[in-house]
Amino acid sequence: MEESSEPQLDAKSKVTSQLIDFEWKLGMAVSSDSCRSLKYPYVAVMLKVADHSGQVKNKSFEMTIPQFQNFYRQFKEIAAIIETV
């Protein structure tokens, strides 16, 4: 069995930010520079995170419905793992 050359760190030492708030909303584009994206639903996600010094920052991004479904599925998997710890 090969040894990893990377140092092994516990989960707490890898945490760089803390999730403070998570909001999402469903939207539909009605006008755009790119007509191909009109009338397609999207999910807007707004995150509030605190870095290791406590400074809070807002982050936002948009995802298609399939991207959001995958994002949600991954969060469910994370939650299931956390429950076993």
UniProtKB/Swiss-Prot annotation:
GO cellular component, one term: nucleus
Domain COMM: 18-85
Stored InterPro entries: COMM, COMMD4/6/7/8
Primary location class: nucleus
UniProt KW Transmembrane keyword: no
Disulfide bonds: none
Annotated positions of the N-acetylmethionine modification: 1
Biological processes, Gene Ontology terms: signal transduction
Protein location: Nucleus; Cytoplasm
Single GO molecular function: NF-kappaB binding
Pfam families: COMM_domain
Keyword annotations from UniProtKB, A to Z: Acetylation, Cytoplasm, Nucleus, Transcription, Transcription regulation, Ubl conjugation pathway
Quaternary structure (record): Component of the commander complex consisting of the CCC subcomplex and the retriever subcomplex. Component of the CCC (COMMD/CCDC22/CCDC93) subcomplex consisting of COMMD1, COMMD2, COMMD3, COMMD4, COMMD5, COMMD6, COMMD7, COMMD8, COMMD9, COMMD10, CCDC22 and CCDC93; within the complex forms a heterodimer with COMMD1. May form a homodimer with isoform 1. Interacts with RELA, RELB, NFKB1/p105. Does not interact with NFKBIB. Interacts with CCDC22, CCDC93, SCNN1B, CUL4A.
Family: Belongs to the COMM domain-containing protein 6 family.
Its biological purpose: Scaffold protein in the commander complex that is essential for endosomal recycling of transmembrane cargos; the commander complex is composed of the CCC subcomplex and the retriever subcomplex. May modulate activity of cullin-RING E3 ubiquitin ligase (CRL) complexes. Down-regulates activation of NF-kappa-B. Inhibits TNF-induced NFKB1 activation.
Name assigned to this protein: COMM domain-containing protein 6
Source species of the chain: Bos taurus
Gene: COMMD6
